[in-house]
């Protein structure tokens, strides 16, 4: 006999994240008081994490279509066609709240979840990336969080057998109480063998696959839809526990069963577990679903229907199976040592029915749970415009050489080698360009093609001007893919914001989305998948708006990709793009001048596209020997990174006479690249760029073992490398 269910009270409703008007909507919808299990189901499906109820109305404006897009948003991952019947499947997703509470497990299950999203579509994962945002280094929890998250990301990816090839790591005090862990996975599939989540056919068996269900992860999706407070550590039991070795078995079993043509529809059990996967499959297929929880494999005794429906135990899948393939499918999963259980059937009723112990625990309309969940048009206000900071109004407290050394040893600009060396970035043998460059390059087996992969966003720009910040995030992803020789094709996004019930926060989201949309259209890079993470606040203090952009591009010949390292002495250093010396929101202004203010640099998308096409053409023609986009830290930081990577110095000319020196070296004007060319090609390159109207300035020549800046003191490369490489390991070792 099952234990009596709790009485539905206002306190119980509130603890499930449901507001009074939402509960009233439930009463109106079903005409009675919900059962405890039904309350849990509504809580899971109507929370922000699963329903996107605050953002969905604005997401509809994003460009999602192109001739090469095979599957846009709405499925487990996006899919693009890269020719030769090959498709790239990719998505980015957050695991922010769990990673703050339990950094190792939060990060591992974030990686595991995004990998499942990719191989659920029928793709074999070939690469992972991430975007990590931590609090101020001086905060007492930051070092612990960095250590746990990085170990978790590496621990899962390394054990599963997928290389982690790139990403971002940043620090800012606004992430003190709410770090961000955004994970991206990329896979390859046959373009004509993509598997979707929509069920079809009445009476089809619904099969539970993978690991057993436990009580870990209870209420995880609801936790991810709420602000933190001082008692957040008490939510540790809601963090899931991952097993990468079980996931590897699940991957191989799923790909084998797909190859045997057993699958009608398949969905991974991620947020809200069995509830979300079953509802989505039925709702997308315009069918009902009936589940018998007595058949669910469990690893704990006495689990209730509520617990089984809301558990977020990892490494699980739900599949609608072709009936005639039942025995064959079961044999495959048993071979891999995984659970295989028929737990229900599709029905024509459009109802979601859950049975346990011979009793009906839930009987709800499935469409209203799924794709017809509440939709809010929340009030929003536009972010106020900040004044433009003029370079001549900023006094330089030190020379360019000294400022460069200081900047290279700051948390955001220092080398992240300590992070990525903990990841196996070459497992599989297809990594062409490792972390540390503009974009990762991964070879596609059995051919010359490669993929260029990157993750980008500049949150301080997004806070200062959400529209320009949204544009810039897409533009930088475009530049980074271009800088390695890739043709940008599509984007996945991960929108991390604070409390959407505050109009100023909602305004940030709306502004960023408008900027992202405009940039995607101009740069011909549709958004094919994504994730929204709201309520990233602690005690009323929100994070910086952080719309992470994951970019994917293709190279026809991966052997012709470019890198940022200087290749030889005596090569001309060219700056492509115009420099006005934009210091507003720059790293220089913050770290050297102690000011975090002003309007961010504007983004001219037509110029971005024109300059990108030119640089890509130079790479393909073989005239560009090294390429690096200019972003955080400005021109001199970009040159220093190229010199350090190639172990070759440079002699640099003084800034043009009309330019303020520190603005020339450290301004963060957009649409710029540093390119090196051989002396023999220099005249032809400069002539061509002048003819087509693309700004090109020769700013120096490679050579030696130092940076020699006209009018400044010389800086030895060893000193620059020490500054660049030592800050993070020293910090993690407690030395600073």
Swiss-Prot record:
Active site: 49, 95
Gene Ontology CC annotations of this record: cytoplasm
EC number, as in UniProt: 6.3.5.3
Residues at which substrate binds: 94-97, 116, 240, 312-314, 533
Residues annotated as binding Mg(2+) 2: 117, 268
InterPro entries named among the record's database cross-references: PRibForGlyAmidine_synth_PurL, PurL_linker, PurM-like_C_dom, PurM-like_C_sf, PurM-like_N, PurM-like_N_sf
Keyword Cytoplasm appears in the UniProt entry: yes
Function: Part of the phosphoribosylformylglycinamidine synthase complex involved in the purines biosynthetic pathway. Catalyzes the ATP-dependent conversion of formylglycinamide ribonucleotide (FGAR) and glutamine to yield formylglycinamidine ribonucleotide (FGAM) and glutamate. The FGAM synthase complex is composed of three subunits. PurQ produces an ammonia molecule by converting glutamine to glutamate. PurL transfers the ammonia molecule to FGAR to form FGAM in an ATP-dependent manner.
NCBIfam families: FGAM_synth_II, PRK01213.1
Subunit: Monomer. Part of the FGAM synthase complex composed of 1 PurL, 1 PurQ and 2 PurS subunits.
Protein's name according to its UniProt entry: Phosphoribosylformylglycinamidine synthase subunit PurL
Underlying gene: purL
